[in-house]
Structures are given as structure tokens and as C-alpha cells.
From Swiss-Prot:
Residues 1-53 form a propeptide. It catalyses: Cleavage of peptide bonds with very broad specificity. GO terms for molecular function: threonine-type endopeptidase activity. The formation of the proteasomal ATPase ARC-20S proteasome complex, likely via the docking of the C-termini of ARC into the intersubunit pockets in the alpha-rings, may trigger opening of the gate for substrate entry. Interconversion between the open-gate and close-gate conformations leads to a dynamic regulation of the 20S proteasome proteolysis activity. Component of the proteasome core, a large protease complex with broad specificity involved in protein degradation. HAMAP family: Proteasome_B_B. This is Proteasome subunit beta. It comes from Geodermatophilus obscurus (strain ATCC 25078 / DSM 43160 / JCM 3152 / CCUG 61914 / KCC A-0152 / KCTC 9177 / NBRC 13315 / NRRL B-3577 / G-20). The active site is at T54 (nucleophile). The gene is prcB. The 20S proteasome core is composed of 14 alpha and 14 beta subunits that assemble into four stacked heptameric rings, resulting in a barrel-shaped structure. The two inner rings, each composed of seven catalytic beta subunits, are sandwiched by two outer rings, each composed of seven alpha subunits. The catalytic chamber with the active sites is on the inside of the barrel. Has a gated structure, the ends of the cylinder being occluded by the N-termini of the alpha-subunits. Is capped by the proteasome-associated ATPase, ARC.
Amino acid sequence: MSEYSAGRSGFSPAYLDRVGSSFTDFLAAAAPHLLPGSRPVPQIPVGNVTPHGTTIVSVTYDGGVLMGGDRRATMGNLISSREIEKVYPADAWSVIGIAGAAGIAIEMVRLYQVELEHYEKIEGLTLSLDGKANRLAQMIRGNLGAALQGLAVVPLFAGFDLDAAPGAAPGRIFSYDVTGGNYEERGYSAVGSGSLFARNSLKKTWRPNLDGDAATRSLVEALYDAADDDSATGGPDPVRRLYPIVYRVDAEGAVRVPDDEIAAVATRITDERSAADGQG
């Protein structure tokens, strides 16, 4: 008799035993082969034959937090995609951006979204922002074996803290390393191949208590500067009408900033720099 037909219910015992509010723990008990980090990988480096997402940037502002990512994925020295989306809503109050092995990263994001939804259904309440950050750290740690073979996933996580103390900034950002260590960032952060250039740009344009428009400009300009110096980061592409994916998370929740708004910001940056070059 198949393990899935065991018992009168027709379900495996793993489906009937309550393993807690973690969907990842349930999956580990019921179907561990479906977890991203549990699959065998070749004992050779495979980093140059899989698409990799590149640069993700996040900045806080006076009403919350923004996160954006470019649209390029690379495979070694080749551009494997110009239209990949790297920033996703994790739930109603948080977002996640991916850098690293794109296939595994996207699968991890989907599992993480289910993880947060499962917790809310089981417990009847939303996990705290710190709790969400810690859950993501556990999932990254589970991918360590694949990371050591070149299939690393290094996300950036940000959200609106519903439990923020009066006077404290509600927008918060968390970065990670491949071992699952998570670190809260102050003000802004960036991950991926162009992160060094993005951070250098943010040092000049970001300041505390920016309004939403200024923060959006700072973020898009950071991605523009990253693309200028990093071949794996794609800049705004008006010919194909491809612009960074940007999400805003504030007291109203997580929403995607319309492409037309991002296009207008990118156009202003390009026009201003073109005018400055002409005067030089």
C-alpha cells in the first residue's frame, strides 16, 4: 500500500499530524524532496550555467520603505533575460528582492509567501516583521548545500513594522548572507553584483526622512549608477520600455509603483545627466 493511501482518510500521517504553524516544517515532514535546498546538486561549480539575478536596492523614507530591482539576469558573460522580475510582495506588509541563482531564488520566494500565509491561517494573526525576517533566514540556511556549489540565494527583505514604537521609523530593511545570517540595515541597503556602485550612489542621495518621491528618485538613480559600472545590472531601457520593478510599503500595505511613474523618474535622471554632460 502506498504511503499516501495509508489510513482511512487516504492521506499520509504527515498530512494529518499538526507540525506547527510553519509550512516549511510541514513540507519537510510530508514531502522533503520539494524543499529547494534538499535536492542533490552536481559536485562541480554550476554558477556560470544558471541564470543569476543581479542588483536589488531598498531605501527607507518618512512613510515606509521602497525596494527596487533591475530587469537583467545573466548566465556567465551572456544576458539570459532582460525582463526578469526580482522584487515580490512577501505578504500585505513586506517585500522580498532576490539576487543569486534565479530559479532557486524564485522558488524560495514562492515557498516563503506560502509560509507567511500558512502561519496567518494557523495562528490567526500576522507574524511580526522580526519573525518574518527570521523565517526567511531559516530558509536561506536550508539552501547552504546548494550555495556551496555555486547556487547561492542572497535576498533583501523589507517591510512596514505594524508594531513600531511611537517616533520610530516604520520602514525596516534586512540583509542576509548565504549562511542565513540576517542583519538589519539603517536607511538603505543593496545586494547583488552592482550593490557596491548602488551603495556609493545612495551615500550621496539618501538622507533621513525623505519623502516618497525623493526616495523613489534616490532608488532609481542608485540602480542607474549600478548599471553604468556593472555589466550584469540592466539600466532603464526606453526602447523596450523596460524599467526597474519598484514596490512601496507603507501604512496602506505593499503596492507596486506603476511603470509610468518609474519611467518618468528615469527619464528625468537621463535628461539631467545629458544636459550636464553637454554643458561640460
